[in-house]
Every structure is written in C-alpha cells, then in structure tokens.
C-alpha cells in the first residue's frame, strides 16, 4: 500500500469514533494522540474535555453514560496507572467504556522513565477486568478500534486499545547534548 | 473564624426539597450518600459507595450529556480533596447546569473523624490540618460563582445556588461533626445506574 495515498490511521480512528456516535472525548494530551485530539476539537459533534489526571476520565465516562452519551478516553500508557482504582467503576456500574492508549516504554523507547508503567500497562488493565486489544500495524487500526467500540457499546464491556509504539513510531528528540 | 453551626441532614433535605425529574443528583461516598438518601431515595439520585474523588467528574460528564437538566453534586471535603484538578476541568467546560455543594466537616468522617486537610493548623495533636479553603481553591481553578456558607441565614441563598443559579456554581458549607444513623440506598452499582437511566432516558 502506498503510504502517500492510504488514509492515515489517526484520521481513521476519528471516523470510527464518529461512526459509533461518541459525543465526549477526554484526554491527557499525548504526542501520539495529538492529530486525533485536533480532529475532535474541530468537530461540531464531539465535546473535548482535557483532564488534569486520567482517572477523571473514567468518572466522566460514567456520568456521560448516565446521561445517555457515549465517550472515549485518550491517554498514554503512563496514565493507565493513575486510573486503577477508578477503573473499578466500569465493573461496579457495568457501563460501556472505551479507552485508546498510546504506548510508551516498549519498541525503541529512549526514556528509561517510561518503561515501568509501559511494561505494566497490559497487566494492570487485565487485572482490573478491562479487555485489552492491541494493534501495531497501521492497516489494522481502523478494524481494531471499530471492534473495540462494538465490544464496549454493543457488548457492554470495558475495552482498551493499545496503540503500540511500533505503530506510533520511535519518539526521537533529535540530537541532544547530555550533561 | 466562627465555628460551624449547620447540621448536614436537615440542610441536604432543604436543598433537595421538591426535587422533580429535572434534578439529577450525584453524592460522594460515605456521609453525603447517606444524607441524600435520608432526604428520600429516588431513581435520579446516584449515591456512590466507593470511587472516592469521582463525583465532580461524574457530575460534569452528566451535565454535558444533559444540558437541559440541573445536575447537583453533593460531596464531602475529603472526597473533593482527592480530585482538586476536577474543579479546573469543570472550569474548562463552564457547564451552566452544574452545581457543586461540598459539606465540609473538616474530618474524614467515615473512618474515625481524623482531621482532614480543611481542619485548622495548630489545632492540637489529633485535630490539626492545613486550613485548606476549598472555596478559594475552586475560585482559583476558574469557577467564578463561589461561596462559603456558615450560618442558617445563608441557607435560602444556598438552596437557590444549588437548584437554579446559572452554573458552574460552587458552595462550600461548613457543617458540624455529628454521629448520625446510616441511611442506605441500594448498593448494587449496576442497579443504581440502570434505574437512573430508566428514569431519565426511558431505557436502562
């Protein structure tokens, strides 16, 4: 497939969110999500709420569902650890929950501080009863996010999609001087 | 600073008086949950039994989803202290239909009345906190309509602020420490959610 003409996977995620009638999108910003966040901000049908910490997003999603709206939480793997106790709310209330997580601390990571939570992310999610979907190929992003949204909003599950670092690309700050 | 005089239960009963289908209520875990339940359990109450730090965010998500309804969050000082950032998040959205009432007894009331951060400083070995002012914090987070209620004469304005004033509204209410009966709503979270949605949306 020609990368120049094929749709960008970040644009495809936005389409999937629209298809599934997502009305509220919460985020602690991440470079891997920035293009998607901007799409959502420009949209007239999606309310974008920046968070101070990721756990706010779980409670917001519960409130949105109580009010009849679907939502999605965008975060980085480092934020998953902040949500653990609040993630229990998805089980206690049994409401559909969708989160899209950009991974750090794995493929080609340069920052040692990202590894502990990055490596712990799938285990933590599984421990809290969240279904974990994973994607590392651009061509499979759309189908994976769509399947996750179906499991969440049709199947009533709590679902996380891990957008692997191999997909996002190695973060590189270019030439740096170490002191 | 004057001592608190207000009792939480009669106060919450006044705030919720004549609640109709246009009032959606979320209460934080522990005392606030028992308070709204004593005032009268109803499907459009969402009393939390856990999820400390959740009520303000949950109220925001609900307020954004239901702009034509009034959303009232009632919670305690320690619950809010766990999620101070949620006040700034509320301020980014400026929901006109959201009111937050914090019942501040300056204690972790459910666990033995340990001093919370809103207790005064230098208040003895077991009752000292930071003197943290949640109303000032709310103001600093970007919520313009903020007030502190200490006296019975201020209660009518408090009820108005909670029920009808254009939001986002934040009121800190200093309440006395009391030993009160537990008045419990249903505990099952899925049931509480389903009955709330059934009453609001006509489907679980």
Predicted features, each with a name:
Chain A
Residues 1-179:
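Thiamine diphosphate
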């Amino acid at each position: 497939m020609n990368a120049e003409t094929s749709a960008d996977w970040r644009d495809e995620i936005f389409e999937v969110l629209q298809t599934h009638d997502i009305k509220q999108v919460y985020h602690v910003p991440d470079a891997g999500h920035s293009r998607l966040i901007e799409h959502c901000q420009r949209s007239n049908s999606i309310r974008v709420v920046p968070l101070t910490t990721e756990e706010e997003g779980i409670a917001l999603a519960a409130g949105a569902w109580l009010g009849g709206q679907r939502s999605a939480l965008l975060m980085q793997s480092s934020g998953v650890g902040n949500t653990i106790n609040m993630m229990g709310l998805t089980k206690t209330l049994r409401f559909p929950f969708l989160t899209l997580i950009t991974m750090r601390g794995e493929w080609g990571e340069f920052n040692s501080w990202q590894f502990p939570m990055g490596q712990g992310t799938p285990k933590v999610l599984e421990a809290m009863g969240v279904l974990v979907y994973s994607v590392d190929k651009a061509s499979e992003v759309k189908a994976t996010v769509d399947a996750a949204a179906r499991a969440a909003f049709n199947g009533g599950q709590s679902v996380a999609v891990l957008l692997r670092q191999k997909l996002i690309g190695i973060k590189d700050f270019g030439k740096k001087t170490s002191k | 600073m004057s001592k608190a005089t207000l009792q939480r239960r009669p106060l919450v009963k006044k705030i919720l008086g004549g609640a109709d289908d246009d009032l959606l209520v979320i209460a934080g875990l522990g005392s606030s949950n028992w308070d709204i339940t004593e005032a009268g359990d109803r499907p459009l109450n969402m009393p939390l039994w856990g999820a400390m730090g959740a009520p303000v965010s949950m109220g925001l998500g609900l307020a954004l989803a239901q702009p034509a309804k009034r959303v009232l969050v009632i919670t305690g000082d320690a619950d809010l202290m766990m999620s101070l950032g949620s006040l700034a998040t509320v301020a980014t959205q400026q929901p006109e239909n959201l009111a937050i009432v914090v019942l501040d007894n300056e204690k972790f009331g459910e666990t033995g009345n340990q001093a919370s951060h809103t207790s005064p400083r230098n208040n003895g070995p077991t009752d000292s906190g930071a003197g943290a002012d949640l109303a000032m914090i709310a103001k600093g987070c970007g919520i313009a309509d903020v007030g502190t209620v200490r006296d019975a004469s201020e209660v009518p304005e408090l009820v108005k602020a909670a029920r009808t004033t254009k939001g986002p509204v934040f009121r800190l209410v200093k309440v006395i420490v009391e030993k009160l009966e537990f008045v419990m709503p249903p505990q099952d979270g899925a049931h509480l959610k389903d009955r709330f949605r059934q009453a609001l949306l006509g489907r679980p």
